[in-house]
């Protein structure tokens, strides 16, 4: 019996192109100005200090900009980059320059499932801060109340079964009572290895898997 939904964001509830092109493009464009403006503030100092330790060398403003831009261009899932992007996106969302994209079918189904009493959690490579901003300033307004919790890669890789075991443990819900939704096969496989039910969301490609849907309207619980 399913009691909880665990959903990916990028490519699942939301357009992968919006995240990659609009949000990543915005963080890359604003990166230098943001670091320059907030260089002496504690949160940026901590990020730069951690980056220095990671690369084993002193990091000045110019180097920090180059390193983080390189991470963005190569789509490196770096925790420090995610933290920095969260701060940059916060300014963008609060100013109205950014609005979190949600597919209409995902919005309607998540709302319906919440009203039926299902627990709903998000799991993304984006930081928890970024997830809350994304859903807090979405095209449908603030929908963070749909969610009972948010998880990011501090739980581990989304392709590692242990991450899903940790999430189940953190929520105190048996893995067998979860339905995981993602557009990435390796993530689906990892969640199944952890004991979860899982469905591949294949919005842009024909479904070739048994447990596969084109959009959220096909979820029947």
UniProtKB/Swiss-Prot annotation:
A GO molecular-function annotation: magnesium ion binding
Co-factor requirement: Mg(2+)
InterPro entries found in the cross-reference section: Enolase-ppase_E1, HAD-like_sf, HAD-SF_hydro_IA, HAD_sf
EC number from the UniProt entry: 3.1.3.77
Record keywords: Amino-acid biosynthesis, Hydrolase, Magnesium, Metal-binding, Methionine biosynthesis
Presence of the UniProt keyword Disulfide bond in the record: no
Gene Ontology BP, a term: L-methionine salvage from methylthioadenosine
Keyword Endoplasmic reticulum part of the UniProt annotation: no
Binding note for cofactor: Binds 1 Mg(2+) ion per subunit.
Substrates-to-products reaction catalysed: 5-methylsulfanyl-2,3-dioxopentyl phosphate + H2O = 1,2-dihydroxy-5-(methylsulfanyl)pent-1-en-3-one + phosphate
Family to which the UniProt record says this protein belongs: Belongs to the HAD-like hydrolase superfamily. MasA/MtnC family.
HAMAP family documented for this protein: Salvage_MtnC (MF_01681)
Function as written in the Swiss-Prot or TrEMBL entry: Bifunctional enzyme that catalyzes the enolization of 2,3-diketo-5-methylthiopentyl-1-phosphate (DK-MTP-1-P) into the intermediate 2-hydroxy-3-keto-5-methylthiopentenyl-1-phosphate (HK-MTPenyl-1-P), which is then dephosphorylated to form the acireductone 1,2-dihydroxy-3-keto-5-methylthiopentene (DHK-MTPene).
Quaternary organization: Monomer.
Name recorded for this polypeptide: Enolase-phosphatase E1
Species classification: Bacteria, Pseudomonadati, Aquificota, Aquificia, Aquificales
